[in-house]
Amino acid sequence: MSIKTFRDLEHHGWLERATSYDVITPVTNQAIDPILATFGDINGLSILEVASGLGHLCGTGAHSGAHMHGIDFASTMVELAKSSYPNVNFSEGDAEDLGFEDQTFDGVVCAFGLLHLQNPDRAIREAHRVLRNGGRFTYTVWCTPDDGGEFFGFLMGAIQAHGDLDIDLPAAPPFYRFADDQEIESAISAAGFSSYKVSTVPVVWRSDEAQDAVDVIYKATVRTKSILEAQTVESRQAIHSAIISGLEEYRVGDHFQLSLPALMVSAVK
């Protein structure tokens, strides 16, 4: 497959990650209940999840009585989601060009998906378009290291210290763009939403094994895995060693623990 754009990189990567992505869902699933809580009583609501992945949020919403529909551009993710949650409607779809009529849904959610899109502003506009008047769009992204995001800050610190970031990969949107106050205001207002609220969701990564932090990169990321694979063998081994040894600073009893809080934005049409 020819990888020419950031979208190509992400699409190809997530097609390959479907069977291993559950190594990170104990982390991402910590945001499910807070996301759904922004809609109040969801029983009977029609909610679209964009970038639905393995379908855990949709499955939780359906269990509470919502009419959930999940879309993802990775067919492998869609098939696994269908298998896990047969009572939910999952389909392949493009977040930047939703195949739904205007004002179709009461709610739209995007849990940690905006950072994987070529044109996230277009996706936010599409969410606004398919929402009914008074509907709500809620998204989550990772907080920056300065705002408590230890986990990804720690991993990238090891990569920067022992690797080379000047590599030949498609240009990517800024990873933390939608955790910035000015960028949030600009994107949400430009899409036409009438109001929004920002909050922080506590999320932590825990594991008994330091190697698990390295495995997260290879099994549950696309661009970070691509950065590592572009390194020399020696640099890659040095990065692995730095991650494993560096985790001792984050040991809590018999396990390792790092924070990676989520920034949650909930906007009303």
Predicted regions and their residues:
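A short SAM/SAH-binding and catalytic strip from SAM-dependent methyltransferases
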Residues: 106-120, 143
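Conserved Class I S-adenosyl-L-methionine
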Residues: 3, 28, 54-56, 174-269
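A short, aliphatic-rich alpha-helical micro-motif
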Residues: 41-42, 102, 124
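Conserved class I S-adenosyl-L-methionine
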Residues: 1-43, 56-60, 76-80, 84
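Class I SAM-dependent methyltransferase SAM/SAH-binding core
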Residues: 46-98, 107, 122
